[in-house]
């Protein structure tokens, strides 16, 4: 890619401890409450991750596992297996039972410009959507995992 591409960065503050948020990101039973339909997550660096969605699946490898403050993994879409990116999630204890969730989706600069032009905005909107669902789950609000933007 000829030009530098910014990372996708999304941040949200939630009313839960870092331990609870970390579990919702790393335990399959927690993940399926707000994000994929089914999940495999091996809780260790080098572990497998597989997320099943109505539109396809994502696979990857856990690259960072630091309970309860950070998790990272590679992100490989089933429809574009040759285009891996990386997702890193950092959790900051804000006190009073609140946690800041910062997600950074990187690796776009190594991908073809047409792929980035099409899929980076979708991922940006998708992460914003699903982080809101994480907050909805934590707050006890209904969680509607419907996500039409990736149904291409």
Question: Which role does the model predict for each range below?
Answer:
Residues 43-48:
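Short coil-to-beta transition motif at edge beta-strands of beta-rich domains
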């Amino acid at each position: 890619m000829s030009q530098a591409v910014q990372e996708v960065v999304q941040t949200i503050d939630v009313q839960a401890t870092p331990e609870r948020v970390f579990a919702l990101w790393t335990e399959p039973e927690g993940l399926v409450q707000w994000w994929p339909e089914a999940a495999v997550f091996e809780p260790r660096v080098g572990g497998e991750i597989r997320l099943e969605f109505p539109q396809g699946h994502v696979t990857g490898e856990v690259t960072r596992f630091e309970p309860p403050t950070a998790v990272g993994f590679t992100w490989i879409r089933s429809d574009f297996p040759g285009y891996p990116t990386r997702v890193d999630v950092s959790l900051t204890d804000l006190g009073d039972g609140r946690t800041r969730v910062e997600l950074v989706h990187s690796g776009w600069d190594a991908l073809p410009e047409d792929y980035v032009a099409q899929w980076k905005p979708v991922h940006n909107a998708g992460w914003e959507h699903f982080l809101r669902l994480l907050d909805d789950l934590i707050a006890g609000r209904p969680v509607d995992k419907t996500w039409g933007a990736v149904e291409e």
